[in-house]
Amino acid sequence: MRLPPQVNERIDRSTNVQFAFNGKSIEAFDGDTVASALYASGMRIFSRSFKYHRPRGLLCGAGHCPNCLMNVDGVPNVRTCITPVREGMVVHHQNAWPSLNNDLLSVNDKLDFLMPVGFYYKTFTHPRVWKIAESVIRRAAGLGVVPEDGSSVVE
């Protein structure tokens, strides 16, 4: 769903760009950001909140919030609201499984009474328990997977 053409708009509607989002081909215009192209294609949920996995849509559009963080060409935590689309780029969602619309960990929202602020620091105090709990909690937080070879580290 696109707005009608505007005077002084930043996109070039005469030049199409294609990229992949979660394996699906998305049409964009030259000058689109990844997030604006996804929004124009009908997407409304861009991420999930860290603890309760509540749905998050576009918020700031300026790269100042975590709502649009995605994996772009293998690099985690890219702010897609300020990242221009490029032909052939590959984008994947983060912090939701199996999909953004149907995230199984969104059940955490219904179990919030079991997870007050800081519960993990008070509950998993034994070193052996914390070692296991830490990896589960970090994975649930969903801030992407950092490649072990450092191939996508931005300097």
Indicate where each model-derived feature is located.
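Short, structural beta-strand-to-alpha-helix junction motif
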Residues: 33-36, 84
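Fe-S ferredoxin-like electron-transfer domains
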Residues: 55, 61, 66-155
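Short, electropositive, low-hydrophobicity segments enriched in small/polar residues
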Residues: 27, 35, 67
